[in-house]
Amino acid sequence: MRKQTIYNVILCSVLSLYTSFSAYAQSEIAFTNKVTYTKTGSISGVRLVSLMPAPITNEYQEISELASNCGEFISINKANKVLFYDGPFNNNSSDVTESFMYKSKPIRIDFSKTENKNEVTGIDPNGYLGSDGTFIDLSNTTIVNTGDQLWAESSNKLDYAKRCYEYVASHYRYINGSWRTLAQIISIGGGECGDFATLFVNLMRYKGIPARHNMGVWKDGGYHVWPDFYHEDYGWIPVDPTFKNSNPGADYFGRYDGNLIILSQGLTSFTSGDINIEEVPLQTFYYWYWYQSGNGGVDGVHKTSKDYLVNGINSVKTNIETVGTILNLNGMKLPHLKRGINIINGKKVFVK
């Protein structure tokens, strides 16, 4: 082969503004997750390698009827599975698709009770204590100083975790963008949902408390990442510092409302032949390609059911109401709305 090109793609984790915490709670839905690959130029003799996360049943969801149109599902550990395709790419456009049934498992941790732990048998929490030096760097000066300060103020591990959650939410700004390293997050003073999760996970692991990222897609479209941590009395405890940052008056500690399809937990390592990734967030997909002749490349686009299926449109009613603050269905304040008509929670909102 004349030329080798490698592409890694991780899409920005953006917070969906159209998701209801309660509309689909504990309901089962059919869902499709796919990547569309398209050739550009006139290349031929193409080998395509595609790697995308595949959901499994865990603390927050039940997955059944998992199927794909190509490739194979590979379990890389007890918490994560991937759909891996390695083969020819002969057409100008081709999809790698996985479909499944999804049922949410909303969680509210009752801290007055310890008899029902939120955990899945077989997943060792100690697997979420390590440091990769990029996303997780337990020697980072800011993490060390902040962690020591909050630990000194805390009465126990649970108190420390809540202080970390509140600290991240109140001391960092929400800044749009793609995944950042820990050093980049601290340097710019904030980040998006994945970055808020990274800060929390680092603070927890620094004190020997297992913690991880939960990465996925909203059932109604968009991406989100939030962390959880392990406590010996309660199991895995979900928190969302991003939501807390946007809505400081609400409480997202020990609460998961069941509206996210989790595609992977923690950072992912994967090796197959000449393909290797080490400790990376796998939320959407990675791909690589090689070609024998011609000029051009291969583009990849991630899509979910919401991106290309329309299940009908409800009739529209006009209802004019004057309000000072506009919230999404997650109870989060919506800043930076445009003057004119905005579509919020399926309604037209006019901003003067």
Q: Model-predicted segments: where are they?
A:
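Bacterial N-terminal signal peptides that target proteins for export
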Residues: 1-10
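Bacterial N-terminal signal peptides
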Residues: 9-20
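Intrinsically disordered, low-complexity N-terminal segments that are enriched in acidic
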Residues: 25-107
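Secondary-structure boundary elements
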Residues: 100-188, 199, 279-309
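Active-site neighborhood of thiol-dependent amide/isopeptide-bond enzymes
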Residues: 153-233, 247-250, 255-261
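Active-site rim recognition segments
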Residues: 220-309
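Residue-level detector of functionally pivotal "anchor" positions at catalytic/ligand-binding pockets or at interdomain
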Residues: 309-330
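C-terminal tail/sorting-segment detector
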Residues: 341-352
